[in-house]
């Protein structure tokens, strides 16, 4: 069984955890929360342990949090980073790389430049085999994923005929 921590419990993280929580091969170790809002109680009411950045614990004093994000990561095999855009790169450097923990990042991050979270933008239809063995992978947004699922079969079947794709 894989122990998975979802770091970020907003519009993306709350959906991800609802999807993975019933998988018999996954144990959800908890969720990371960055802002002390109603989503904290929402996660707790749904039975999830909530962890917050150690430096922000005082801001969450009105909530029944389970500890700091660092301790949750120490108990996890994989983290799905659904934190606010740009925070994933900071988390990678501060938390994930020092712990050598496998990480999947949401579409608000980048695969380009010095703040790149990965060199791979994952799409199961396009580069599934390339993701095997990677420590850090970025999952594209729903729009990017959808385009990959449509465009990859076209590229595969009509590679010599297609000069370019225009997507609007």
Model-derived regions: residue spans:
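N-terminal Rossmann-like NAD(P) cofactor-binding subdomain of oxidoreductases
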Residues: 1-168
